[in-house]
Amino acid sequence: MRHTVIGAGRYMVAIMNEALELRIGNKVLEVGAGSGYHAATVAEQIGPQGHVYTIELVPELVKLARSNLEEAGYSDRVTLVQGDGSLGYPDRAPYDRIVVTAAAPKIPHPLVAQLRPGGILIIPVGGRLFPQELVKVRKDEKGRIERTSLGGVAFVPLIGKEGFDL
């Protein structure tokens, strides 16, 4: 099976990164590495003091992203992992920020659990195709979450235990 990378587009990457309120030194989880482009933009914004962990389900895309990130000089600031991103990456949790680049039917509980108090999660939520909305989840210091809609979007589905079936 051949996999095609359908990126969120530069405009959507910028919207998502702005909504993340990235800070120098943040520890960030990206779900859905794709080509590695979005992880590179996040790594650039959080600087060498921060780190991006990106998890991708498709082994071929892990290979593509790794190659692109190495070529662009980000391999020391971005760690790529192959696995079910809908479950997050608990090995390095908690995260200051989490960004999901595929639409989930609901906000996955494992991602909220891996978000540090005071953290922000950006995720497209909705149907396998449409409608979908970009959601900003803010976790307060007591672990309560506040959900804000950032508007309608169109993303590929998040495949996994907490996402959609293949």
Where are these regions (language model features)?
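Residue-level detector of conserved, well-ordered beta-strand and adjacent loop positions
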Residues: R2, R138, G151
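Extracytoplasmic beta-sandwich strand-turn segments characteristic of Greek-key/jelly-roll folds
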Residues: R2-H3, D96
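Conserved alpha-helix/loop element of class I SAM-dependent methyltransferases that forms part
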Residues: H3-K27
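Conserved nucleotide-cofactor-binding alpha/beta core module
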Residues: E21-L134, R138-R144
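Conserved histidine-centered catalytic loops in small-molecule metabolism enzymes
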Residues: E146-G160
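Positively charged
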Residues: E162-L166
